[in-house]
Amino acid sequence: MKHTLLSRFAIVMAVALYAAPALVLAQDIQHCSNATSAGRWGFTTNGVLILPTGAVPVTAVGHFVQDLHGNMEGSQVRSVGGGVAHETFTGTVTTNPDCTAKYTISVYDDSGNLVRISVLDAVFTNGGRKARVVFESVTLPDGTSLPSVLSIDGDKQ
């Protein structure tokens, strides 16, 4: 009897230990949508623009609000090579079930003139409260493409 009870206990423990990693993995799988990424965000941008004259450092800090339909608007203060500007922006985002996303953002100067259009690739982590982003493209209003190495670190507020 004692031997049978110990054998059963050992089998139950072995099954539990074998199944535990699968249960943890199942809990880690996230299914994201625009609802996951909706909310108020704060962010910093860092990197370089690659101009014909060479690489120029870029940094920015800003915030935006994104709705459940993937629309967003916000503002930032950015420095490109030491030249500071206040900018506003509007855009759209499509958030995928695997928690990746693509943003298309139109950026405007203080007078409301279009300055550039940026396409960004993002991944949401920490239950949709953290975003890591890389710029896919930066295009000026005349169609000129600016090569860049820019990233954004964002936090849902």
Can you name each region flagged by the protein language model?
Residues 4, 20-23:
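A short linear-motif detector with a strong N-terminal bias
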Residues 1-12:
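Bacterial N-terminal signal peptides that target proteins for export
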Residues 23-157:
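Mature soluble binding/inhibitory domains
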Residues 10-21:
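Bacterial N-terminal signal peptides
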Residues 5, 17, 43-45:
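Hydrophobic alpha-helical context, especially transmembrane and signal-peptide helices
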